[in-house]
């Protein structure tokens, strides 16, 4: 009897405190775009309006939704995909034990119950990518959905996709995903990496990490599983993921050849691409820019090649003394991608793994090749984003953004940090968030989170939470710096709540309400402290905001401007001092 993964096995939390799930009706029948609405209390009887924010949590935070992981979540895109009339259902490839990294399927593996689902692909001669539709002047339902989420016009979304400045990752076999967009003229997005390894984690844990990450604000998920049950883990994640899912197909291909890089072949890799496309993976990291001639350049580096995918392909190239088969077969890969609308995330296999290697010849040589490959993908109307570093000191970050925009013709940049120093293992979520905020400001479209476990171990769900929140801070700071028209609204609301001592509103408006409340209550746990005009930092006598309130009240009572009130108050205090005898100590 094969086991299943149930909601009881994982921790699923409802909406964040003070929030509720709301839906905005779209222009098409049945289109409902989710938002999170944060309630606010009154100020002296005057209402404060609720604040609506972008929501990535899917149906899990809707109290009306019954979670049944074995059935998957609703499929809002299915009718849109079928309604375009350019796809066919077909039998698909046979799922084999090797897909899960074993010779014989285990009876203990919790196979997803709906495995009889037939995959979709483009009809003969058709192209089903969002870029293809956009270039033909078609505004899809997905584009309309995204426009509501981003607060822009659908035509703007279409144009950004058509010109390659943004991607809308939306595999036709992942109808569960709520459409989102990645581009520098939209909100900066955050990706969270999850996935098992050969020594750690289970399917249930990875599904839990996915729901956990999206609850805290992850815009996409990458399943980087490298151990057993890769196919099955991915199926459970995709069928229950409300956000796009990315993978690095070379990891699974390597498992199929028993971890021996030189045994990899184009045929094994191609089969893996089709397998994952049929499951519904929305974007593939493909290290097609690691060319044979670039590998010797890395020999003088401090940390060599640190990308797993990059090192696998480098090993294959050196063993066979042949060019990277991902590069030589790139046009064939494009043909597969456009049948399912899988987006490219062109991998930076030669990214710097240390500050000493930042912005070196190997890194930028690969970037030149990624620019070449971008043009080829666009020729097929396949969506592309470019992966970036890595480890880069602050003064070298801007050059990365400028070169990417120039060499890759404005394709969205997707960066891992970058980490701005190498000396803080255990705190690399901080070292990288510094770089992430900067490069997001300069134009990076999506930031790949880093957790405190980076360089040390596989992150657990608490590390995932810390990583996501840290990167939501960086992304939001970048949105503010870029002047995104709605970015400041939440900041303004929280600042107003802080000045008015509306403690619960402060908690609820924050990126992590539970943590904010927890820290406040460590020193002032009483319910009355939630309305007190001070916190434990300054106490009641030294609270600057309480003093500011007193000044304003004094000005109001005496019909004065605030500056006049301060001057008048100082004169009155001086008179009191004189009348008391002008003694310094009473």
UniProtKB/Swiss-Prot annotation:
Q: Binding residues for substrate, per the UniProt record?
A: 193, 222, 251, 287, 307-309, 348-351, 387, 414
Q: Which reaction does it catalyse?
A: 5-amino-1-(5-phospho-beta-D-ribosyl)imidazole + S-adenosyl-L-methionine = 4-amino-2-methyl-5-(phosphooxymethyl)pyrimidine + CO + 5'-deoxyadenosine + formate + L-methionine + 3 H(+)
Q: State the residue spans of region: Disordered.
A: 1-33
The pathway noted for it is: Cofactor biosynthesis; thiamine diphosphate biosynthesis
Q: Name one GO molecular function term.
A: zinc ion binding
Q: Where does Zn(2+) bind?
A: 391, 455
User: Which EC number(s) does UniProt give?
Assistant: 4.1.99.17
What does the record list as GO biological process?
thiamine biosynthetic process; thiamine diphosphate biosynthetic process
Per the record, its GO cellular-component terms are: cytosol
NCBIfam families cross-referenced by the UniProt entry: PRK09284.1 (NF006763), PRK13352.1 (NF009895), thiC (TIGR00190)
The free-text function statement in the UniProt record for this protein reads: Catalyzes the synthesis of the hydroxymethylpyrimidine phosphate (HMP-P) moiety of thiamine from aminoimidazole ribotide (AIR) in a radical S-adenosyl-L-methionine (SAM)-dependent reaction.
By sequence similarity, the record places it as follows:
Belongs to the ThiC family.
Q: Which PANTHER family match?
A: PHOSPHOMETHYLPYRIMIDINE SYNTHASE, CHLOROPLASTIC, THIAMINE BIOSYNTHESIS PROTEIN THIC
Which protein is depicted? Phosphomethylpyrimidine synthase
What's the source species for this entry?
Bacillus cereus (strain G9842)
């Amino acid at each position: 009897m094969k086991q299943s993964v149930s909601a009881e096995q994982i921790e699923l939390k409802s909406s964040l405190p003070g929030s509720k799930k709301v839906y905005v009706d779209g222009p098409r029948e049945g289109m409902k775009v989710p938002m999170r609405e944060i309630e606010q209390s009154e100020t002296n009887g005057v209402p404060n309006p609720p604040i609506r924010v972008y929501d990535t949590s899917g149906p899990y935070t809707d109290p009306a939704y019954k979670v049944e992981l074995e059935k998957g979540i609703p499929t809002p895109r299915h009718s849109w995909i079928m309604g375009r009339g350019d796809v066919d259902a077909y039998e698909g490839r046979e799922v084999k034990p090797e897909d899960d990294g074993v010779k014989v399927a285990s009876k203990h593996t919790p196979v997803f119950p709906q495995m009889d689902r037939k995959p979709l692909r483009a009809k003969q001669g058709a192209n089903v990518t969002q870029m293809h539709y956009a270039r033909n002047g078609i505004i899809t339902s997905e584009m309309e959905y995204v426009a509501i989420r981003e607060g822009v016009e659908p035509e703007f979304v279409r144009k950004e996709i058509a010109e390659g400045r943004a991607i809308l990752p939306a595999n036709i076999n992942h109808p569960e995903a709520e459409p989102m967009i990645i581009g520098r003229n939209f909100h900066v997005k955050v990706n969270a990496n999850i996935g098992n390894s050969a020594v750690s984690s289970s399917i249930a844990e990875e599904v839990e990490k996915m729901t956990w990450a999206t609850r805290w604000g992850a815009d996409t998920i990458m399943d980087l599983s490298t151990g057993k049950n890769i196919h099955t883990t991915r199926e459970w994640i995709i069928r229950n993921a409300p956000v796009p899912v990315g993978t690095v197909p070379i990891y699974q291909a390597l498992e199929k050849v028993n971890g021996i890089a030189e045994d990899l072949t184009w045929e094994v890799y191609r089969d893996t691409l089709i397998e994952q496309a049929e499951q519904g993976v929305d974007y593939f990291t493909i290290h097609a820019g690691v060319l044979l001639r670039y590998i010797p350049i890395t020999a003088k580096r401090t940390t060599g090649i640190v990308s797993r995918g990059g090192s696998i392909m480098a090993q294959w190239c050196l063993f066979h003394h042949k060019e990277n088969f991902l590069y030589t077969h790139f046009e064939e890969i494009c043909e597969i991608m456009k049948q399912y609308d899988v987006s490219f995330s062109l991998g930076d296999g030669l990214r710097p793994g240390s500050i000493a290697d930042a912005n070196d010849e190997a890194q930028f040589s690969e970037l030149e090749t990624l620019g070449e490959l971008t043009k080829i993908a666009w020729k097929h109307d396949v969506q592309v984003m470019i992966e970036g570093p890595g480890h880069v000191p602050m003064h070298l970050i801007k050059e990365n953004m400028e070169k990417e925009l120039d060499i890759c013709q404005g394709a969205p940049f997707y960066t891992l940090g970058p980490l701005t120093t190498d000396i803080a293992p255990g705190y690399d979520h901080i070292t990288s968030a510094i770089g992430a905020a900067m490069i997001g400001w300069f134009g990076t479209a999506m930031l790949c989170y880093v957790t405190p476990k980076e360089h040390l171990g596989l992150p657990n769900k608490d590390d995932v939470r810390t990583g996501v929140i840290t990167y939501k801070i960086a992304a939001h700071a970048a949105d503010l710096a870029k002047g995104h028209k709605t970015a400041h609204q939440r900041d303004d609301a929280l600042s107003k709540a802080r000045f008015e001592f509306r403690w619960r509103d402060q908690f609820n408006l924050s990126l992590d309400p539970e943590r904010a409340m927890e820290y406040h209550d460590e020193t002032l746990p009483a319910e009355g402290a939630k309305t007190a005009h001070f916190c434990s930092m300054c106490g009641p006598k030294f609270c600057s905001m309480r003093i500011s309130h007193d000044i304003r009240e004094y000005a109001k009572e005496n019909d004065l401007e605030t500056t006049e009130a301060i001057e008048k108050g100082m004169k009155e205090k001086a008179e009191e001092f004189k009348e008391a005898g002008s003694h310094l100590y009473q």
